[in-house]
Structure formats: C-alpha cells, structure tokens
Amino acid sequence: MRIAFVVARVGEERNVIQRLSLVLADELRKQGENVDIFPFNRRKVFSFFSYKKLSNYDCVLISNVGLQCAYFSIFKRLGLVKKLFVAISFGSDIRATRNKLINLFNRISRPAIDLLIVVNPDLVVVAKSRGYKNVQYVPSWASALP
C-alpha cells in the first residue's frame, strides 16, 4: 500500500508529535508499506494544487487533526481527492474545546476522516462526543491501517 503521510512542519526543531509521527512512518516501512512523508507548513495553504500529489497513493495518513487535516479534508469534501483518510490524534487537538481555531479545524475535518486513530484509550469517548464516527484506540498504530 502506498501511504502519503502528512506531517506538520518537519524540520530541524521537532516537537513530540513530529518525532512520534516519524517513528510511526519508520515502523510502517519496516512492515513493508511504502510511506512518503509530506511536510506541511502554512505556505501550503495558499498552494491550491498540492492535492494532486496524493493521486498516486492509496491512503492519506495525517499526523494530527489540525490545519493540515482541515486543508486536505476540504479537497476530499469537494471530491478532488478520493482516497482513504486516516488521522491520528495525540489528544491536544481533540481536547481543545475552548480554542476556536482548533474547533473550526475539527468541524471541517470531521466529515472527511474515514478513521480516527487515538493514542490514549480515554480519547475514544472524547472523540465520539465531538462527532467522530469511526474512532479506534490502537496500542500498535500500524495495525489500524487498512
């Protein structure tokens, strides 16, 4: 399976989510999957044709339900991208109920996400209460990918 893995701001300064995402990409490669990392930054928001790069992939894996997820979800909702969308939530994006910008990203992304993988078992209830339908807690992340 060819997987396009969208990770926000991959560079020299990596936060915990970026490091975990790169570890996950390496684990998927060890299992024989073809994983390409797509770094996402705020400049990509103004590039309206970046979705065309996803046409050669079977699945789009997004490292967090944030701006990058909302951006590619718009293309899926418009019918420009017809790939399986899998998002991974590390908790900060799902739990942030007071942050209006993150709430907007969640509302945009929710209908386009085919599978939401959460890394903590308590996030299943939180995600379902926020309207996500197919939520799965996976101790071994790679086993949740179709």
Question: Where do the protein language model's features map onto the residues?
Answer:
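Donor nucleotide-sugar binding/catalytic pocket of nucleotide-sugar-dependent glycosyltransferases
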Residues: 113-146
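A short beta-strand-loop structural module common to alpha/beta enzyme folds
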Residues: 34-44
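Short acidic/histidine-rich motifs immediately flanking catalytic phosphotransfer sites
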Residues: 54-59
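A short, histidine- and acid-enriched strand-loop-helix "catalytic/donor-clamping" loop
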Residues: 85-100
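Membrane-proximal helix-turn-helix segments that form the acceptor-binding/catalytic region
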Residues: 99-116
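Nucleotide-activated donor-dependent transferases that construct or modify glycoconjugates
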Residues: 1-14
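Short amphipathic alpha-helix
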Residues: 15-28
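Short His-centered aromatic/hydrophobic patch
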Residues: 62-68, 89
